[in-house]
């Protein structure tokens, strides 16, 4: 199931601090369903960090369905999320998607969160 993000369920950080990255992610990949998700402590608070079926990382508030940020992971970031989720490896279809994303849109790697 795709994730719908609009002005009511996204934080200022996502669309005010990083508008170009968010626009490109929406344009190139969209916000698809979460395949692997972990809890992670960010800036003293826990958040949900998920890898989507499009190969994008979406970070969401723990207690609300609000997006904090999204970014295109490199291979190590994807592996780390899967390891923390208890998986031995990134699911093969997702791994191929991430590698294609990196080949097609390497500029997004430099738009960090």
Predicted feature descriptions by range:
Residues 1-113:
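Ribonuclease/tRNase effector modules and their secretory precursors
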């Amino acid at each position: 199931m795709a994730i719908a993000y609009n002005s009511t369920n996204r934080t200022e950080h996502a669309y005010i601090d990083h508008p170009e990255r968010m626009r490109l992610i929406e344009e190139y990949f969209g916000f698809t369903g979460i395949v692997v998700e972990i809890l992670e402590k960010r800036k003293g608070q826990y958040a949900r960090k998920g890898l989507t079926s499009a190969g994008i990382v979406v970070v969401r508030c723990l207690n609300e369905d609000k997006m904090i940020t999204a970014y295109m992971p490199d291979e190590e970031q994807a592996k780390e999320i899967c390891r923390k989720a208890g998986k031995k490896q990134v699911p093969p279809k997702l791994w191929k998607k991430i590698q294609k994303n990196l080949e097609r849109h390497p500029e997004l790697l430099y738009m960090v969160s």
